[in-house]
Every structure is written in structure tokens, then in C-alpha cells.
Regions:
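Nucleotide and nucleotide-moiety/phosphate-recognizing core
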Residues: 1-181
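Glycine-rich phosphate/pyrophosphate-binding loop and the adjoining helix
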Residues: 174-195
Length: 195
């Protein structure tokens, strides 16, 4: 298998949460640490993309902090920074820092679909279409595509799936490994920490 970079997007403002949600405790551990641990289980390098003001204090050993200096430009800009930081990896596995329950089995399945095919991206299918995270990308085609999208004024993370050759794993396939669909659960408000 190719070298894999795990990119954890953690640059959001937590506006609905009311404080820095990534440091909030979920099952007794900071929320961000859950996402990092799941990504670390299946990748060779873990890159945590945070805002310029973030110091990254207390990040788990082995997690590498990179700053997204384009603050306010959206998650696609953070993805671009992460991809450019993954220069030694052919494959990038992308999750959001507020996704504490993403299944390692589902992440492995995403990687297997990419490794076994010719596509440049693999996403999980949902009733609303492909989920923008977690996703797996071929690093350089994705970096080029994201660069083009940003220059065209596009900012949504899911936009990259629109322009890359993307395979979408059928919902019945991936939910067999994650029947509760926890791989798509993200924390937006304090009450979400209780779910």
C-alpha cells in the first residue's frame, strides 16, 4: 500500500458550540484526540490543520501541527494546506477534528477502495449524496484540484469530490461495518457530547 497521510481538519471557529469544541471532553478525552487516534491507526503521518492562532498544545505524540493562514476561507483552504504538507504521501485520508467516532474499519475500507481502483477520491455514500468527510484522496491530483477550486472562489469541502474522479461506497456496504453510522457523527453543539 502507498504511503498514507492522515489529515485532520481542525481550523473551524466552533461558533455553534460557544467555545473551543476540540478541547471539550468526549468520553473523558479531548474531542480532537479521538479523530487523531482513529486516523493514526491507519496512516503513516498525522497532520492536524489548525488556525494560525492555535498552538496545538497537548496534541498526541506523532501528530504534526500545520497552520492554515487563510483563516476564514473555509475547510477547502484547510484541506489545501494539509495536502501540501503531505508531500511524502501518495494518499491522504481526511477527517474533521470534531468526528470522534469515525470507524477505523470504515477508514480501512475507504483506503482499500482507492488502492484497488483508478479513481482519485473515495467517499461514503449517504441518502444526500457523498459525504465530504471522511474521504480518501490521491494527494497530488487532489492538491491540484483544490488549488483550482480555491482560485475559482469555491470553498466547500465537498467541491473536491465534484471535480475528481470519485468512487462512492454504497451506504449499505459501509454501514455493515458501522451500523450506527457513527463515522459521520460530528459535534456541533455541547449537547452533541452526550450522544
Amino acid at each position: 500500500m502507498s504511503a498514507i497521510a492522515g489529515i485532520v481538519l481542525a481550523g473551524g471557529r466552533s461558533s455553534r458550540f460557544g467555545s473551543d469544541k476540540l478541547t471539550a471532553l468526549y468520553d473523558g478525552i479531548p474531542l480532537l484526540h479521538h479523530a487523531i487516534a482513529h486516523v493514526a491507526a491507519v496512516s503513516d503521518d498525522v497532520i492536524v490543520v489548525m488556525s494560525p492562532s492555535a498552538e496545538g498544545e497537548g496534541l498526541p505524540a506523532g501528530a504534526r501541527l500545520v497552520h492554515d493562514s487563510s483563516e476564514g476561507e473555509g475547510p477547502l483552504a484547510g484541506l489545501h494546506v494539509g495536502l501540501l504538507s503531505a508531500v511524502r504521501s501518495d494518499v491522504a485520508l481526511v477527517v474533521a477534528g470534531d468526528m470522534p467516532d469515525v470507524s477505523v474499519d470504515v477508514l480501512r475500507e475507504l483506503l482499500l477502495f482507492l488502492e484497488g481502483g483508478q479513481s482519485d477520491a473515495v467517499a461514503l455514500g449517504t441518502e444526500l449524496g457523498p459525504s465530504p468527510v471522511p474521504i480518501v484522496l490521491r494527494t497530488w491530483p487532489a492538491a491540484d484540484a483544490v488549488h483550482t477550486l480555491l482560485h475559482a472562489g469555491r470553498r466547500r469541502l465537498g467541491d473536491v469530490l465534484d471535480v475528481l474522479d470519485t468512487v462512492v461506497i454504497d451506504e449499505t456496504t459501509w454501514t455493515a461495518m458501522d451500523p450506527g453510522r457513527r463515522s459521520l457523527f460530528d459535534v456541533d453543539e455541547p449537547s452533541d457530547l452526550e450522544r
